[in-house]
Amino acid sequence: MKNTFLNTVKGSLIISCQALPNEPLHSSFIMSRMALAAKGAGAAGIRANSVVDIQAIQDEVDLPLIGLSKVDYPDSPVYITPTIKEMRAVAATGCAVVACDVTGQPRPNGEKLAEIVATMRTEFPDTLLMADTDTIENVKVADKLGFDIIGTTMHGYTPATTGANIADNDFAYLKEVLQATSRPVIAEGKVDTPEKMKRCLDLGCHAVVVGGAITRPLEIAQRFISAL
């Protein structure tokens, strides 16, 4: 199954279908239809948040999924599949990939990332693990821990990378990431135009995830309204 996912999405677009509780489209049904639209457009895969959304999407489309679970804990800034509890729950859906935060910030309950990875390898040996990283240092951490896929997801979204954009200086950061690891790299985070997606692939990314620019109509509309 591991090679199947990587082969399926190689050189392609993965569409993130997510809506948090404070967003207008927050609904597992709506996310499943968003995934159906993504499939109709030719997406090679879907990235989805929460067990209920993942299951609803699986019922609607047969595309491979990157699953995650966003949960806020009072004792940690980490919120993307932060503990072994969420990792297990997402993996149990049968999604091809489980994504989690790899930003070096303290996890809830004092959990250690290395222990989480070891547990997942034992309990879900066929599930790919994707590292949502923010810096080159954490790309190297993820590589050393044996993550199957390196994502640039958190670049620009952590205290260490505030204000950063993947497209800055002709994608200089992404080029560094590609030099720092031999594992498949999936570009994600602020890839908001077809041209940026194509550039990521041309530079050597295995695939690209696009979310907000496609599946968040409130944000899309705001871009137009702000230009008035």
UniProtKB/Swiss-Prot annotation:
It catalyses: an N-acyl-D-glucosamine 6-phosphate = an N-acyl-D-mannosamine 6-phosphate. Keywords: Carbohydrate metabolism, Isomerase. Belongs to the NanE family. It is an enzyme of class 5 (isomerase). The lineage of its organism: Bacteria, Bacillati, Bacillota, Bacilli, Lactobacillales. This is Putative N-acetylmannosamine-6-phosphate 2-epimerase. Converts N-acetylmannosamine-6-phosphate (ManNAc-6-P) to N-acetylglucosamine-6-phosphate (GlcNAc-6-P). It comes from Lactiplantibacillus plantarum (strain ATCC BAA-793 / NCIMB 8826 / WCFS1) (Lactobacillus plantarum). GO terms for molecular function: N-acylglucosamine-6-phosphate 2-epimerase activity. The keyword Isomerase applies. Pathway: Amino-sugar metabolism; N-acetylneuraminate degradation; D-fructose 6-phosphate from N-acetylneuraminate: step 3/5. Signal peptide: none annotated. GO terms for biological process: carbohydrate metabolic process; N-acetylmannosamine catabolic process; N-acetylneuraminate catabolic process. Pfam families: NanE. GO terms for cellular component: cytosol. The keyword Isomerase applies. Its EC number is 5.1.3.9.
